[in-house]
């Protein structure tokens, strides 16, 4: 009995030691990307100076607001893809309206009369 417990522990330890070595060749590390808006903003900032339309001598407040709005715009989920996924997952928003018209023909079937309150067939047969 003592020998079997020792073998079980050794087997468990050997399995645990193999598991981390198998996990190492996983996915490559992710490199942080810069959003497309920031790549465009950096060359403009390097150009120096203000835009021709800026009338304020500081001009920092408007620039900060633009940067914030650009970041928020980049963080938003693409609405077109979101709508496509919603359409795919939910058959049709008014599907109940269409299903109701099709069920009227079922009440004349061979399996009995439709029970309106429950929404199932009575099971009376032909």
UniProtKB/Swiss-Prot annotation:
GO molecular function: hormone activity; signaling receptor binding
One Pfam family hit: ANP
SMART domains per the UniProt record, alphabetical: NAT_PEP
Biased composition (Pro residues): 26-35
Propeptide residue interval(s): 24-73
Subcellular localization, as worded in the UniProt entry: Secreted
Cystine crosslinks: 110-126
Leader sequence residues: 1-23
Tree of life domain: Eukaryota
Swiss-Prot/TrEMBL GO biological process terms: blood vessel diameter maintenance; cGMP biosynthetic process; growth plate cartilage chondrocyte differentiation; growth plate cartilage chondrocyte proliferation; ossification; receptor guanylyl cyclase signaling pathway
Main location: secreted
Record-stated family: Belongs to the natriuretic peptide family.
Protein name per the record: C-type natriuretic peptide
Species annotation: Ovis aries
């Amino acid at each position: 009995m003592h020998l079997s417990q020792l073998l079980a522990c050794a087997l468990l330890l050997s399995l645990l030691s193999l598991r981390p070595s198998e996990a190492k060749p996983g996915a490559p590390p992710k490199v942080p990307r810069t959003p497309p808006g920031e790549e465009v903003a950096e060359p403009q900032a390097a150009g120096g100076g203000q835009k021709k339309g800026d009338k304020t001598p500081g001009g920092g407040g408007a620039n900060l607001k633009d940067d914030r709005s650009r970041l928020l715009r980049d963080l938003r989920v693409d609405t077109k893809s979101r709508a496509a996924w919603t359409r795919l997952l939910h058959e049709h928003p008014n599907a109940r309206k269409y299903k109701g018209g099709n069920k009227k023909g079922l009440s004349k079937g061979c399996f009995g009369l439709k029970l309106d309150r429950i929404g199932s067939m009575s099971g009376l047969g032909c």
